Amino acid sequence: MLSFLESDYNDIEWVEYYTNKIDTNECYDSGKMSELYYERAKHNYRLGEYLKSNTDLEKSHQLLPNDDNLVSFAFIYEKLGNTKKCLELLNKYKKANPEEEFIKDYINDIVNFGCYDDISKKKFEALKDWLIIENSFLDNIKIKFNTNDNREIISQKDIGLNESILEISLKCMMTTELGKETEIGKEVIDKNLSLYSKHNWISFILLENLHKSDSIWRTYIDILPKKFDNVPIFFKKNYLNMLKGCTCLSKILSKIASLQTEYKFLFNNLETFKKYSLAEYIWARTVVITRIYGVVIDGIKTQALVPFADMLNHNNNPETQWFFDDINKVFKIVSKKKFNVNVPIYDSYGKKCNSRFFVNYGFVLDRNMENTVRFNFDLKSTEVSGLKYKKTFLSNSSNKTHILGEIEQNRNNFNIFLAKARYYVCNDEDLFDESFSTFLVPISIQNEINVLKYIMRMCINHIRKYSSSAKNDLDIVLNPFHKYNREYSNVRNCIIMRYGEKFIYDYYIKMATMCIKLLTRDFEDLIETNLLLDALSGKYHLYVSDSICDLLNTDGKIDKYLFE
């Protein structure tokens, strides 16, 4: 399976390639010429050559009309800043394809972004004025508005190494301690209630100030999203259906149930809380979970919402550092490198699987090497043996499932996964009562072959649960013109989310296929064909060197090959 994670196009070379094809015009029919113009249009789009891309797409469409091209044209006009033309094309597509739910969200997003863009900018200016009055520092940054749900902080000037990117006064930070001073917070303390989440404290501040026109937090609350359409707990059914089979789907449903349980608990136990609706509570909790910082103030660990700082988007290598300056009583973000003017500035939300980014924050990373999937051990599989003797092992629910990423992400975690699989497929009664550590290393060639078959079967069973094939997902995300591939859209995020999981299952199918060959072929054949050497230098080299070579060397064949 080709991974778009590994796809690095040289778009300039591809434009030249398709230009040569078009110019030679080797008696191609209209369908082929349409395809050539379409392909060149895609590469020009990726290069930011939107006018050239538009010209090529028009030629392609004239030769072979296609309704989906209307959305592709809309993408181009959106990039060109022609909102009117963009909406005209999207509405035309919607009229011809009313069943396509996603198109309504595209239209609403563009309409709302246009309507509220100026208003939002004024609100941010008001917030900035308040922060500066309270001794915050924001001279080095400005806000770039991408969509309703996506804004980013960019540099307003050149920023030097170890220079302050921004500083936010403690007076402007919503902290856990302030939450305990709210009316709701005081009642919680008086009644000695145990809250479901520490995030509740700051949620209480938001709720009590939500409708107060004279609140000191007014300018901050005014810029907070009124809706979180990009966060999966608010998704409509059509998006949830796209996530069928995904690990994150159960997390989304669990999150919704958890918030409802929290609300019911607070409503039933606190008089000061009864005035707030479930919708208001979920809004406040979502604000907190999508923006919270864990900070140390005067030596005390606490949590806080920090205006402006909470708009930095995530990057695994942000080249910034944040901390609370106890001397000056400000939250600081400083540079770990020099930044030129007009470049994005990032924070890190930590290394997480896309399912956590998606459920908690409403975004996914195209290139996320921290992705994991859940393996549910299929106890009915033909490879599994002797379950009636393994009841003690089965009594621990954690032994029936395993969260796993690629091998190099966490080698020890992979070895534990293998040990569970080895025990399940083990048919040697003498080993049933052995300690778990026995299975951290291979026990026999036949057992390991059965383990690999078992892993392959589990992967295939998981892949069958998804609502689309991996190839279909890949075709979408590799095509910048595909109607489901609009930047920052929910539909695209769903596709990236599910493809990332399928990629890991496919990763282990390939591992199992290759390693079964290594364990079943003659040793001389492995050497002559370079299968073993290739495996030792490939992406599964840790497993091959740790386990496969250990098994192949039981009679000293590898030692003999290496040292004679």
Regions found by a protein language model. Give the residues of each.
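Intrinsically disordered, low-complexity polar regions and short flexible loop motifs
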Residues: I184-I189, S194, R486
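Carbohydrate-active enzymes and regulators
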Residues: Y196-N200, I345
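Alpha-helical tetratricopeptide repeat
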Residues: M1-C115
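Long, positively charged leader/targeting segments at protein N-termini
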Residues: L87, Y116-C172, T176-E181, E208-E564
